[in-house]
Amino acid sequence: MAEKESSKKVTTKKPAATHRRRDGCNSITELKDRNGSSLQAIKKYIATNFDVQMDRQLLFIKRALKSGVEKGKLVQTKGKGAECAGGQGTGVGEGKKEKEKAKLLAQREKARKGXXXXXXXXXXXXXXXXXAAKKVKAAPKKAKKPVKKTTEKKEKKKS
């Protein structure tokens, strides 16, 4: 009997899906689609990797994807609603947003301190470039239409 117990297969259980938005983001990063991942691909990934009943959880997954797009966590590359292709937004890695904000603040401080004259020169150069691009073309001259000559018709005399 001890042999029968040891010969039983040990099956590994799929982890239960805990958070729909996080699972959706993880599926998008794991799928690594170049133009974003479709809803069908995301559903398939979640169904294979998590212990979820997709017919019951589909509404929650769609809602999580929509809210992820609204909050900026996901980027919607095509279509509308949740029936679209989506890509990973910069919001998932919050460090990226902080770095961008820090760069902007550093640039603003440099402009305030000593580069005020350089900023004015850059603004003047940008205005000159915009004016050069907006050259107005002269209206093309219209060709004169030939005037029809009117000829008098001779009346025929009846004899």
Swiss-Prot record:
Keywords: Chromosome, DNA-binding, Nucleus. One of its GO terms (molecular function) is structural constituent of chromatin. The keyword Nucleus applies. Residues 1-31, 80-99, 132-159 are annotated as: Disordered. SMART domains: H15. Residues 10-22, 134-148 have a biased composition (Basic residues). It is found in: Nucleus; Chromosome. Residues 84-93 have a biased composition (Gly residues). GO terms for cellular component: nucleosome; nucleus. GO terms for biological process: chromosome condensation; negative regulation of DNA recombination; nucleosome assembly. Pfam families: Linker_histone. Histones H1 are necessary for the condensation of nucleosome chains into higher-order structures. Belongs to the histone H1/H5 family. This is Histone H1. It comes from Psammechinus miliaris (Green sea urchin).
